[in-house]
Amino acid sequence: MEISYGRALWRNFLGQSPDWYKLALIIFLIVNPLVFAVAPFVAGWLLVVEFIFTLAMALKCYPLLPGGLLAIEALLIGMTSPAHVREEIAGNLEVLLLLIFMVAGIYFMKQLLLFVFTRLLLGIRSKMLLSLAFCLAAAFLSAFLDALTVVAVVISVAVGFYGIYHRVASARPDDNDLLDDSHIEQHYREVLEQFRGFLRSLMMHAGVGTALGGVMTMVGEPQNLIIAKAAGWHFGEFFIRMAPVTVPVMVCGLLTCLLVEKYRLFGYGEPLPPTVRKVLQDFDDRSRAQRSRQEQLRLLAQAVIGVWLIVALAFHLAEVGLIGLSVIILATTFSGVTDEHAIGKAFTEALPFTALLTVFFAIVAVIIDQQLFTPVIEFVLQASPHAQLSLFYLFNGLLSSISDNVFVGTVYINEAKTALEHGVISLPQFEMLAVAINTGTNLPSVATPNGQAAFLFLLTSALAPLIRLSYGRMVWMALPYTLVLTLVGLLCVEFTLMPVTNWLLAHGWVTTPTLP
């Protein structure tokens, strides 16, 4: 029997999202104009809370849809103006170009990255050293590349290897249903469960590695570029400015990696079963023997382009997005990718998040127009300059662990910049706050998948159900890293940031720039 038009409309509205979620969004859309008519400030905060809710519920529905509806309504009822949203987008054009071109550029270097992680997985037999290598490799790559892409590559390696062993275990070489374990004997099931534990730990180490490396450079995370632009820092200076906090955090993060593996804590420590290693090694040997000269030259070209990328970023030879565009041109040229549709696939990963980031800027425009964060910032700025650093770090960390860190970082750096322009804080203090904001948004955000886009990407990937990686398990496995990274970051902001930065200034390693 054909359903009614009303029922059909309800089913179409936000698609497969739960009914309670759809109802909640409709209530938000009805309540907001009513509250705005009576108390604009309260309505503004209500909008921010609702938007954070959509980010926290990202697994129910991609936040672009509900967040976009809230932003459109905010524009319609006058909480901000299209002109102000345009100003925010124009001011952050570099970030959008980073997401569009850099992510697409790295897509064409996936073969090289797959090669690197495959060699690590099969070349290192010690689980502790392998975990450390994955964490370090992910950190290094995320300092120059997009964290989402790095995680996507590691996921590709894990899904590929899982599929190889699953087909052997099920005795069905042509079976592509990796979720079906019904044909696997008990012995193989036990080995497969061990293999899942092994892959879970590696994925989490790699995911945390992207956070450790991503906080260190201005291209590591999208919000870093926003903060760097606000502070007037180039690639090298950003790295040096962050070093008093990020270097100790990196060391402690790597030590945490070793400790949880050695003592098998929080679900870590599962080694690669010998039977699985043999199957994977045999497959890799066959693949290497069949690799043509054309494929070998493709890998070499990608390695050279990788060197160009690092050099171009380090010496700031062009804007980040333009460097990404050069990577697309060079990588496609020397990989022989000439078809428009093949090139178009590279942009599918980044564009949904780019659209979501544009919605962020609309919400930021509301925050500025309604002066929502003014009371919070005034409260923080009443504290002593030294205490301000820890308060900014903690406020950022708390919000970033439940919301998207790009959104949080953008809001707080804008508020700090406004305080500087009004003479409330000095330029040196603003620079210290920029470090506290950057580290506060990046480090505690590993607590949940909501804070780190790379974690959310992993949780929603095809790999997660295969290796039994649920939301709760991910939070549990991230817990030791969350505690260590957050506490060490706070201690560094409190005790090492000011003295080390003053030493760097005194010795000419960094200078106080003239802000735009």
Swiss-Prot record:
Record has Ion transport as a keyword: yes
GO molecular function: sodium:proton antiporter activity
Reactions accelerated catalytically: 2 Na(+)(in) + 3 H(+)(out) = 2 Na(+)(out) + 3 H(+)(in)
Topological relation to the membrane, as annotated: Multi-pass membrane protein
Broad class of the protein's primary localization: membrane
CC per GO annotation: plasma membrane
Keyword annotations from UniProtKB, A to Z: Antiport, Cell inner membrane, Cell membrane, Ion transport, Membrane, Sodium, Sodium transport, Transmembrane, Transmembrane helix, Transport
Pfam families: NhaB
Family: Belongs to the NhaB Na(+)/H(+) (TC 2.A.34) antiporter family.
Function description: Na(+)/H(+) antiporter that extrudes sodium in exchange for external protons.
Entries under HAMAP family matching the protein: NhaB (MF_01599)
Protein name in UniProt: Na(+)/H(+) antiporter NhaB
